[in-house]
Structure formats: structure tokens, C-alpha cells
Amino acid sequence: MHLVTSVEELADIIRQGGVIAYPTEAVWGLGCDPFNESAVRRILTLKSRPESKGLILVAGAQEELSPWLNLLDDKAAQRLISLNETPTSWVVPDTTITPSWVRGEHQSVAIRLSQHQPVQRLCAAFQGVIVSTSANPAGLEPAMSAKEVHQYFGCNIDAIFDAPLGDASQPSQVRDILTDNLFRA
């Protein structure tokens, strides 16, 4: 198990096309550069997840979301960047910014502004958004520890971020940015 504490080292791994595991607000996630097709496909293969479902992107700061914020009216943009008690991923219309291998069969993408410090530090070091999908093969419960990540994926990921999980009891809810409709509680 390759535990890493340096966000700069993790960001370099991501830039080089690597796949990492990292603690999110509630569960462990797998992450990579969303614009690196081979890295995204590697995550999809590790999880046995169909590309058609799409993946969530996570940011640690508002500036990292500016390409998507520019597509939204003021009310929707404010909804995306507002602080939520519950981690929330917002489904945003998108056909031009996010690659199809991240969007799946959708004309939209789910993005989240994380309030979890390890995620914020990681995205800042990477200088952008990263993929955020639960660290588990399809049909199994998400990993709740670095040890569980290792049990699921062994040496098939490049690093595990040695940092604490957040305090949320559930993975992020997923809502439509335009209607506020709930897709996943």
C-alpha cells in the first residue's frame, strides 16, 4: 500500500495519468485528471462501472469551477458555490467543457465544491478539478478506510492519500442545478 501525505506528490501522480484514492466528506474516493481519458477509463475498469453513467468532478475552490460557473445564470451559480450542510454534487448542463468519457450519456456533468480540507488541498496542488467516484467495485460498499481501499484495489492504484475522512454520514447528494430537484439523497 503506497500511502502518501504530500499533496504535491499526489498532484504529480495525477498529472502523469495516475489514479489515486483519497478521503472525501463521507467515503473514500478514486480520483484522476478528468481530461486524461486513459486515467478515467482505468477508474471505470477498476470499478466495473459503465461509462454511460458518468462521473462526478470535485473542486476545492470556487476558481476551479469557473468554466462551469460561466455557463450558469447568477442564481444557479450562487447555488453551486453556496455552503451546504450536506455535501452536494450539482448536475450542470455541459456539452463543451467536460469530455464525454466523464459525462457518460449525459449532456451534463455533476460537480461538487468540497468543504473537506484534504480535498481542497489536493485540488489546489493539482490546480483544478479531479474525478470523484466512490472507492469500491460495483455492487460493494464504498471503502471507509485506506485499508479497505487496498483490499479492493491492491496495487492497481498509484497512491492512497494518507488523510482523514470527513464527518458526513452519507456520500454527497446529487441535485439538478437549474431545478434543485434531488437525484440521489
Curated annotation (Swiss-Prot):
Keywords: ATP-binding, Cytoplasm, Nucleotide-binding, Nucleotidyltransferase, Transferase, tRNA processing. It catalyses: L-threonine + hydrogencarbonate + ATP = L-threonylcarbamoyladenylate + diphosphate + H2O. It comes from the Bacteria. Pfam families: Sua5_yciO_yrdC. It is found in: Cytoplasm. Its EC number is 2.7.7.87. One of its GO terms (biological process) is regulation of translational fidelity. One of its GO terms (cellular component) is cytoplasm. SUPFAM superfamilies: YrdC/RibB. Residues 4-185 form the YrdC-like domain. InterPro entries: DHBP_synth_RibB-like_a/b_dom, Sua5-like_dom, TC-AMP_synthase, TC-AMP_synthase_SUA5. It is an enzyme of class 2 (transferase). GO terms for molecular function: ATP binding; double-stranded RNA binding; L-threonylcarbamoyladenylate synthase; tRNA binding. Belongs to the SUA5 family. TsaC subfamily. Required for the formation of a threonylcarbamoyl group on adenosine at position 37 (t(6)A37) in tRNAs that read codons beginning with adenine. Catalyzes the conversion of L-threonine, HCO(3)(-)/CO(2) and ATP to give threonylcarbamoyl-AMP (TC-AMP) as the acyladenylate intermediate, with the release of diphosphate. This is Threonylcarbamoyl-AMP synthase. It comes from Marinomonas sp. (strain MWYL1). The gene is tsaC.
